[in-house]
Amino acid sequence: MRISAELLQDWRNRALRLEEEVGKAILGQQETIRLINVALFARGHVLLEGDVGVGKTTILRAFARAVGGDFERVEGTVDLMPGDLIYHTYVDAGGTPRIEPGPLLRHGERLTTFFFNEINRARPQVQSLLLRAMAERSVSAFNREYRFPFMSVFADRNRVEKEETFELASAARDRFMFELRMPTPSETGVRRALVFNPDYHDVDALLERVTAEVIPWRDLNDISAAIQR
């Protein structure tokens, strides 16, 4: 894709619109919104840190809605295995074993936002699989390769509890474009609104404020490559 001044201006306007839409659901996190937006257009991944309740999941769901495509969330636990990201096995009502696609595969190429909550609770083998998927935007399973070229990975770490956690190695952390600290809002007006305004107590209603798919997400890779030239 050749980039022109008009195209660049058009995408700048789209990026600003994206921030504006996310801001409809999020208060007091303008810097975090801007940096996630930068990572999105640079096709980088983000490691988030922040206290419980600062809105990490909400901000990612807002971005996922504004960007379009599909959102997936996985909880890091000590008993999570690499295969759990790929497939899910169960026995149906008739007693027949079944295999269904796991969180990495079930959306196909529509997967745009993948959130791994508390990544340092997952075993190193699980972390390694995720890091490979981040680097290659693909995984191999069932004798074939599955690709998700539009996926952006976001993860956060539990910084409070140390038991049954597996800290990310420096090489693994390098796979993330940014390590962002989401602060607790300090402005009095923002804190008051978050506590006392009932609009901010219903996340699903908040997300309805965000206009869906304000950018053509299938073009993100092309525009990112064009910008970096």
Residue spans for each PLM region:
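Pre-Walker A (pre-P-loop) alpha-helix and adjacent loop at the N terminus of AAA/AAA+ ATPase modules
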Residues: 8-51
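Short loop/turn elements that form and flank the Walker-type P-loop nucleotide-binding site
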Residues: 34, 41-43, 67, 108-110, ...
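Conserved alpha-helical scaffold flanking the Walker A/P-loop in AAA+ ATPase domains
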Residues: 35-38, 92-115
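Walker A/P-loop
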Residues: 37-78, 90
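Hydrophobic anchor at the beta1->P-loop junction of P-loop NTPases
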Residues: 48, 115-116
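Short beta-strand-centered segment that lines the nucleotide-binding/catalytic pocket of NTP-utilizing
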Residues: 70-83, 142-147
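Conserved NTP-binding/hydrolysis module of P-loop NTPases
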Residues: 80-96
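Canonical AAA+ ATPase core
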Residues: 92-95, 118-129, 134-215, 221-226
